[in-house]
Each structure stands twice: as C-alpha cells, then as structure tokens.
Amino acid sequence: MVKTKSKKILIVVLSTILSIVMVVVLLLFFPLMGKKHTEVWSAKQEFKLDQLQTVEKNSNQDFKILLLTDTQLWMNPKDNKACYDQIRKLVAQTTPDLIATVGDNVSGVTSRFLLKEWIDVMDSFQIPWAPVFGNHDSEIPMTTLNWQGDQLLKSEYCLFQKGPSNLYGCGNYAVNITEKGEPIYTP
C-alpha cells in the first residue's frame, strides 16, 4: 500500500514537472512569426514625403537626437534595470527631440517578454523614437523581426515602419524632420 501511494505521488510530481517544462519550452521556443510586410519597392516609384514618419523641430532650438545602441536587454532583471535607469538619466540630461536605437535592443531567449517592457519604457518618455534591428534582436529565432515589428507598430511614439519586403531586412524606413511644416532633413 505504501509503495503504491509513493508510486502515485511520484507519477503526479513527475507529470507536473513535465507539464511545466513543456509549457516553458512552448513559450520560449515556439517562434512568433508576425505579419510579413508586403509593400514592394521599385526604382520607378515616385518618392512622396508625406509617406514618411515626421518629427517637427522646434524653431527656436537645435534638433537633438539621443542615440542608444546595444542595450541588449536579456534575462538579468538587475542589468535591465541599470540599463533603463541609464536611459532615463540620458533622456533627462539631453531632452532629445528624437531617440534612435540602432540595434541589439533585446537579446536571447527572453526577447519576446522583454520587447513589450522595452517599448513601454521608450514610450514613457513621450518622445518620438526610431528603432532599427541588430544581429542580436533575432539571433535566436523565437521572435522574428516581423513579429517584433508588429509590436513596435502598436507603440504610440515609435516611428518604426516595416518597409518594402523586397529589400533585405525588416525596418527599412526613413524619418522626415520638419520645421514649421516644411522638410529640413530627410535621409
């Protein structure tokens, strides 16, 4: 009787552990694909400024861009907090008109969870921001760049656009800077 009860307990414990492992594997290793961008670029296409994301420059001030690179947020909450604290400090010190993040924003298997947190932090500044992807943003194919792009497109202040599908990568876009409604810089 004791052996049977111990055997049942062991089966329940092992089944529970196996179930937890399966859920974790599904959450971490099932790729989130996202919607593929379908716009196609052609050299014959007419360029239209009004199709670009636009940031208005204050006439009385220089236009300031804060450039952030290689934040590489990952599974260490202490490091992530230090990174966010540093970003907050830089934003407060520089009061930028635009924040650009130039790749390696999130890293590793937890990127699907960290992306939302990162977007929330960036949106909290209420400043337009323009991210691009680096090699670490999709090094582990659990969150494709298309899926990450879908999340960025939901952001209130993010200027990200997926761009044409026939150009390499996801996130080929330009930002138009205007003053009094007139373009002063368009890359």
Where in the sequence are the language-model features?
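N-terminal Sec-pathway targeting helices
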Residues: 2-21
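Hydrophobic alpha-helical membrane-insertion segments, chiefly the h-region
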Residues: 19-30
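Extended active-site neighborhood of metal-dependent phosphoesterases/phosphodiesterases
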Residues: 37-38, 43-50, 116-187
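N-terminal active-site segment of His-dependent metallophosphoesterases
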Residues: 29-117
